[in-house]
Structure formats: C-alpha cells, structure tokens
C-alpha cells in the first residue's frame, strides 16, 4: 500500500520529518556534488593552477547566485505563511511576482559580472599565471547568473508547493547535464576552464527553466505562475526575510576571499588549491544541513501562520536532535575520508596531497556544531524573523570566521587557518542558543 503524501498541515514524527525533508536534502547534496565535479575535472585534466584560478573567483560567483537563495528562502517563508492563513490567491500573486523579480535582477547581475570580472580577479589577488583562467571562467559562469538564481529560487518554492520530489528530479537532471558536459567539454574536447564554465552554465539553465515551464502550465501543486506586476512591499519583505541566507552566502564568500589571501601569503597557490578541496567537500557535507533547513522551513512557516504552537515545539525539539546526530556522524565520516578525498582531487602532487589531508583533519571538527547553527538561522527565517536569522548568519559566517582567520594564524601558524571555522562554529553555537531562549515566549516553540 502506497504511503500517503505528506502535507504541510500534518503532525510530524521523526520518520515523516525525514521523509518530507529528504528530497530537499538530496537536492542540495546533488547540487553540491555536481559542483564538485567541475573541480575534479579541472584539477585532474587541466592542472592545479587553473584549479586555483577557479577557486579564487568562485566566492564572487556565489555572491551573485546567493541573491536567488535570498529571494527563494525569504519568499517561500512569506508564501507558506499566506498558505497557512488560507490566502491562496495572494500566495499565487506573490510567488509569480518574485519569480519575475528574480529574472530581472539576474539579467542585471549577469551583465555586471561579465563587465567587472578582470577587476574582480585582480582585487581577489590573482597572480599573473592565474589571471587568464580567472577571467575566462568567471565571465562565462556569471553570464548564466539569471539561470543560477532561478534554480536557487525554485529549490525553495518546490517545497512550499508540496512538490519536493519534483524539485529533486529537476536538480538531478541539471546535475547529470553538468557531469556529462564536463566530461565532454574538458576530457574529450579539451576546452579547459571554459568547458567547465559552459557545462555549469548550461546545467543551471536546465535547473532554472524546467521549473519555470512546470509552474507556467496547469499543475497539481499548491502554486501557479500568473501575470503579476512588481510590488515593492512583498519584494522588500522577502528580501529582508531571506537576508540571512544572502548574508550567509556573502559572508562565506568574503571569508573565502580572506582565506585565499592568507593562504597566498603564507603558502602560495598550493594553499589555495588545498582550501578549494576543503570547500568542495564542505559543500557536500553542509548541504545535508542546508537541505534539511530548507525542507523543514515551509512546515515551520505554515504552522506559525496557523498558530499551531504545539507543532512548533515538536518541530524544534526533533530538529535539534537530528542536527546533533548528523553533526557527530559527519565529523566521524570526514575524519575517515580525509585521505581518500584528498587523493581524489590532488593525488597527482605528493606535497599538495599531504597538505590537504592534514588540513582536512583539522577542518572537519566544524561539522559537529554546523547543523545546529544552520538550522537555527533557517528556523528564524521560517518564523519570518529575518533580523535574528541574519544576525546569526552574519556573526557565524563573517564576524567569527574572519576574526578567527586573522587571529589564529598569529597564535598557531598555518594550522590556525584550518582551525578557524571550528572556532567560529563554537561561538555561533552560543549565540544561536541565546536567541532561541530569548525569543521562546514570542513564538511559543519551547
């Protein structure tokens, strides 16, 4: 007998919560994996200098794409709340207007990225040997920013529409497109970093255009795309509510730039390459926490809108325990896989492999607390409290990490760079706990 579909209005057990969030977890993990494929192909088929070049400009690319996460997560919280209040038609209009806004903003940012890439590469500290790869890869990828943003927006809205499995299908289709084209353009056609960039851009078109077609046509989801005029208030509300996700993205990117600057100063290109490997693996591991946060957010928003306080308590209690179990599991897994994963990326260079493996074994302790911090920030976004969510993200991903990256190398040498993220997660854990306690009476989740 087939299992009944899960509704936002349901009471959630551990099993039902995992079943509902699993598609978004898989979606985020798969998105991270196919992003990692770029790094694997560039490192193994093009070389470590082009690999370092790609990693150097990646933070800027992610900042632009992060606008889509802001609109998607903030907009989903708003639309899910409207659905919980029974305002179906207003939810349709708001959803449609936010998709239109994403397209327009994405087109503008694509143009900005293409025009400013040489200056951006210089600002990020690219060496003369890295400059051509930085500019070529960066210009091509940022040209597809509109598609990247759409893909990020629809990842969240598929969940609010009660179609998380369809969202997973679209992500898998985009991922397979990227992997196949990477192999074709880099390994067969020998197009180098340009091939990696084109493969990524075309896969983002798949991830952004397929959902657009689905929501434009008659469908069985909770949401429809309809003609809509831009309205400032819901745009600002969505952007403000999703600002924590944008802040997290921007902060991570800025901190990535700071990491690269410190590593170029202390080690050189090998340090940037080693950090690139850590980031690719972190993308996959942290994607599990982000996917859970994205998947559970519409449920929290719905029950908040419906004033189901007992269900909010249930969701918070179960989620905190799941994040703790996930943190321990991923930390152990990262310790075990440090050497094999390092070998997969940079096994062709003995000294770089040794550096990466050592860094990995220090860096991996950050996974213990990352899940709790990511979920707490997303939880407040789902409660339509963008200010608290943004504060947690800002402190966690920028203030604490930047401070640690600057201070710890003075105390611990190069190892201080690899310990920095763990120190930041410890401080963020304290702040997240304080906010949960302070806001408990307002939202009745404890």
Regions picked out by a protein language model, each given a short descriptive name:
Residues 1-21, 79-146, 188-243, 300-366, ...:
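Short alpha-helical transmembrane segments in multi-pass integral membrane proteins
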Residues 9-46, 59-74, 78, 82, ...:
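N-terminal transmembrane alpha-helices
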